[in-house]
Amino acid sequence: MGLKQLEDVTYFRLNNEINRPVNGQIMLHKDKEALDAFFKENVVPNSMVFDSITDKIDYLIKQDYIETAFIKKYRPEFLEELYQFIKDQNFQFKSFMAAYKFYNQYALKTNDGEYYLESMEDRVFFNALYFADGDEAIAIDIANEIIHQRYQPATPSFLNAGRARRGELVSCFLIQVTDDMNSIGRSINSALQLSRIGGGVGISLSNLREAGAPIKGYEGAASGVVPVMKLFEDSFSYSNQLGQRQGAGVVYLNVFHPDIIAFLSTKKENADEKVRVKTLSLGVVVPDKFYELARKNEEMYLFSPYSVEKEYGVPFNYIDITEKYDELVANPNIRKTKIKARDLETEISKLQQESGYPYVVNIDTANRANPVDGKIIMSNLCSEILQVQEPSLINDAQEFLQMGTDVSCNLGSTNVVNMMTSPDFGRSIRAMVRALTFVTDSSHIVAVPTIDHGNSQAHTFGLGAMGLHSYLAQQLIEYGSPESVEFTSIYFMLLNYWTLVESNNIARERGITFHNFEKSDYANGSYFDKYTSGQFVPKSDRVKELFKGIFIPSAADWAELRDKVKADGLYHQNRLAVAPNGSISYINDVSASIHPITQRIEERQEKKIGKIYYPAAGLSTETIPYYTSAYDMDMRKVIDVYAAATEHVDQGLSLTLFMRSDIPTGLYEWKKENKQTTRDLSILRNYAFNKGIKSIYYVRTYTDDGGEVGANQCESCVI
């Protein structure tokens, strides 16, 4: 029949019946009927069938669907054993949305798009073989984690592993621009190249001289950051993966940059077309000093990056504004202008109300918690990657006189619901570290040498989590309650412990550590101080019950790990980051990331299809009270949960604030009226800062007409 000739299918209609209650009952069984119909009408008749996995592999290699090299690293008998092992796990999709997303977005199809060449088991099979790189034991371990949905590789890794005609295994990058035309030109080229391969790109513009600054002694000659933003926006628009998907980028600017107001104004709905950016995302880098000046209702000075670099000999990004603020103010050689700190705070809140932007990076918080040598200066398209970077020096021939380091994000997620029933929590995490290590080792973005250089030195990855709200609801625990906060802390403590264990094992095996390990807090042992006190253990009876049977490291265990790390090092500079999850959380049938759900029955608008309804995982009469929408929740509860995880995460967490334009009565004690105000957002940002939150992603506002502001999720970076 072929997928393009499908007629009279019933699964969309059956799925849509979920949204039509009968006698007050949600028709959840209709989703199971839709799932069954999808396999019967779509998958089974349009899947190519092979007599054996050997025949399938031979066909896929001959037809140039999968690579040969990684298959040849294994014995033919092992390939059959592994495939049988995966089949024996009896994997089944739990919802129509999960199956639909997998077959629509991830399953390999014939070149004409008419037939499926892969099932979920096949995709897991090729992922495990590819990531294990010839090691049979590791291949079994990785397959075991993915097929039981304890581990989910990020979309680019899961989708492309093993394919002959594939994209990169990573799709998220960070680059820094310095204050010269060679760097600007090189960065534009980098953006084009990264967008071409489907990457979402974070760009730091804080080093660029402001509008009106001198160029070669000519006063008023510089155009500032806004024209450069327009160049980047046009680059992403032009380089769009053969017309399949618009490129995606975010530009970050320090709030003490003189162009900060002009920067924010580019996203306003009434902005002049000459300066307005429609598709580029905005982020602000916020030092502690800004919060202090706003709290005191004082004026703030904005400093010229050109004069700062001239005076101090380093780019603006590498000046600690909080530490040197008074010195910069007093220095007559530093150009500066004044604005009211609270006026800027209000401008940020206004724009977040209007567009969901800017993202916020609390840069001093991030650097205080950073255990490695160097400075974090920015984040990525989803605000969870926080890694040190070094600037480059480029001559007029476009050659690197000094090769800096930029960042690629190698991501994956644990599934909280399924991890909590893992037969061996530690072994599960260690298998994930092996899979992610392969991704970082095999990613070579040669078109952008600074990213390739940074990746080869740091060997970083970002393991995160999804399904927290699903797990809490199924355990009849309210999201944001003390038990939920305690659970989150212990869960992420375990992720930290076991990723450290395996990173140390790999460093010992290979005799290699990440660059400048000896200058890190891991090397001197101070990183472990908070753990060797023994404070991170379950305390409440409920949380003790949840972790019953799961190994919880004691102070002595942490001390032993500290000594091993001091002796043999760590292979990975960074290990943990919590990304926002898109399609992969649906495939895993759990809530996205670690934030609350937005709807008990989520409505998704799918291209060319229409609406698909997705009931929250484990939704039942018993769990409904625990599935409170994020839009009806005090955001301080969400911040508290994220703060508990942040304690253990060496990078960042993609924290979205969910607001209603009309805020429910009694939700926030300072509210006299229901209408959302800029003050509400300012209070919440300050609360997050005081709780140690490193970054804030979107502010999503649910408006009276049922629409959302700021909900246009970035696909390039969502995992």
Task: Label the predicted regions.
Residues M1-I719:
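Extended catalytic cores of very large enzyme megasubunits
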